[in-house]
Amino acid sequence: MIKKSIYPKTTRVKCKFDVVEVTEKLDGSNLCIFKKDDMLHIAQRNKILRFDELEDNKNVIYKGLYQWLLDNLDMLQTIRNDSVVCGEWIGMGKLKYSVDEFDKRFYMFAKANINDDFELCNIQYNHEHFIYPFETLEIPKCIGVVPVAYRISYLPSKDNLDVLYARYCEKVNRNVEGFIVNYRDHIEKYVRMKNGTLQDHFDRVE
């Protein structure tokens, strides 16, 4: 006989509903910057590159990224070992962003850790936790944070998001690709623009 409980405890329903954070989905390219064994790395699409490999691979990394990394190296070196900064590299998509509103090239949307197999773990989307990958406990000036569109106290349906999207577009007075809905560090995307063209949101198996 083995004396052990294998079924996990069920979490209690909270008396007070958690806040649902709705952030703007930027039209950018996914980029992760992390440090492993004191060496900075970048991860884009299906490639992971050490900082000392970048010069020989300038032709395969995002446009403008190599020089940006060189210009901001001192600030990026404050990333802790095994910590990951996840975000959007903007400027290559169909939607164009005004420098007055978006004065950065890289906008953080998550923090994480990386294991020895170069897999992400402990991914967190709460903006209050975004300082922790950095030794200074400050987000470097070269890194922005994705805009928060709404903080609401209910899980929005598609119809709710349609209304929120229309209001947000009117508020910012520009095209918006969509939203990311974050509830308890579980995210789902609501997409309204594809290749720069407005469309209705629909479910699709990725």
At which residue positions do the language-model features occur?
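Core nucleotide-handling region used for phosphoryl-transfer chemistry
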Residues: 1-206
